[in-house]
């Protein structure tokens, strides 16, 4: 079925405004969106905040070669429920909620039945994806969205929407590998490779789990930030042979958040025997992994991609309990193109969040 932009759902469509890229220039400008009517199992959400993920930048510029234009990005959505379908029991109008990287799946395969909707072969992403009815999904750089209730997360009262929105991508991306690879047991020693949008959240979750945390970075200037502000226990400059040697075979696991191509052997050497390195960054080119680096010490190299819906709800509740939030810079909708330029230069600490509720309609009217 060819992708279409208009909703195929029965009933009256709901009009929204968004910011869309029309081509690989990536320039975002106002765009009228027709959302489907609120179905029996759906939740309609007024979007108040939406985080900017680095993948948004890749997609608007078609750097991954699968962009469908016009493209409305955004999969770190936080807002308020305005309407629910007749079968919805978990949510009601006025609830504070979020939507992350997925808005649908088959809901019946082994992965879905085991709570791993993120591994469903028929999974539908929040934007730049084709839903079951053939429509193209539009993301959270928009005034409202309609989502099946299974893919909506309830925000705890203690979690502010603006600093919580990025956790729906960055948070679950680092939380899941810690949980499923045994790196959430107090006293374990975890390394966080890279201190950016993912890395700074990984440090915070590691501290919430009671772990010893070492930040590994190529930027010596981030040492004070890591130790004094984020609370890491140690900092290793990856270009220092002396510091890397001192940290050799000391870590139970490493969460690798780096998207640049880096040699794996020096970082695998930081692991204890039976240690695990989990990749959550996506380098453009294949990685060089000398087999001896894994075989010697029985080390494991694994990957992890976001998380299922139950884990996402669990993550946001644990984050609220322990005060884990993203460090953000709130911007208006009219500043989004400048923010994208800055993001391309890594000029943000650590996540941009669009104040959709207060600024999108004004930006669209200009």
Swiss-Prot record:
Pathway: Aromatic compound metabolism; phenylpropanoid biosynthesis. This is Probable cinnamyl alcohol dehydrogenase 3. The keyword Zinc applies. Its cofactor is Zn(2+). NADP(+) binds at residues 55, 173, 194-199, 217-222, 257, 281, 304-306. The keyword Mitochondrion does not apply. Homodimer. It holds the Pfam family ADH_zinc_N. GO terms for molecular function: cinnamyl-alcohol dehydrogenase activity; coniferyl-alcohol dehydrogenase activity; zinc ion binding. Involved in lignin biosynthesis. Catalyzes the final step specific for the production of lignin monomers. Catalyzes the NADPH-dependent reduction of coniferaldehyde, 5-hydroxyconiferaldehyde, sinapaldehyde, 4-coumaraldehyde and caffeyl aldehyde to their respective alcohols. Zn(2+) 1 binds at residues 53, 75-76, 169.
